[in-house]
Amino acid sequence: MAEKNHKPILIVIAGPNGSGKTTITSKVLHHEWLEDAIYVNPDQIAQDKFGNWNDQDSVLKAAQYCEKLREECLRNRRSLIFETVLSTTSKVDFIKRAKEAGFFIRLFFVSTESPLINASRVAARVMEGGHDVPIPKIISRYTKSILNCAAVSPFCDRTYIYDNSINGREAQLLFRMSDGIIKKRYTDNMPEWTTEIIPSN
């Protein structure tokens, strides 16, 4: 246990657009794990550093800036936390490289039972001034995100899987994994979307 405490820590909050990542992040940020960690937040950087999170140029610049920041943390073995849709292999690759570099990795993954739920939430978020994501992207990223969670969980020291399908209710912790193996189940009623993540043996 003492050895773990000397490792740099990587916290990844992942899930399809509109699943509720930011709510989980706001809770995790207060944890003692992250006392010296850098929070890499592209939305905040797009707004604060480049002017507007709904402007495509600002979003692109913020994404590039965040990628450099993550790579610097990896190179310097500096603890960090970031949110991701996890729909591309680049983030999977980053997590694998962090594992090879000796980081202690915690993955918090949250999804819903249908991408239509996610699309409606993103639409509501836009009405309140939040950033937009086109519906076709939300739908295509939904499955990719879940499949990539399954691919990367064996490289994570701790993985926490949440379902956030019910509006107005806190996301439900379904199960916890270590190195891709389920260590604790918190419910007997697993949503269908988790079948891609739950190990077959």
What does each of the following model-derived ranges do?
Residues S26-R78:
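Conserved substrate/cofactor phosphate-moiety recognition/catalytic segment
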Residues K21:
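Conserved lysine of the Walker
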Residues K61-V110, S145, Y160:
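Glycine-rich phosphate-binding loop used to anchor ATP phosphates in small-molecule kinases
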Residues V12-G15:
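The Walker A (P-loop) glycine that initiates the GxxxxGKT/S ATP-binding motif of P-loop NTPases
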Residues G18:
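Walker A (P-loop) phosphate-binding loop of P-loop NTPases
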Residues M1-K7, C73-L74:
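Phosphate-binding P-loop
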Residues A151-N201:
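NTP-dependent small-molecule kinase module
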Residues F103-A151:
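A glycine- and Lys/Arg-enriched "phosphate-lid" helix/loop adjacent to the NTP-binding pocket
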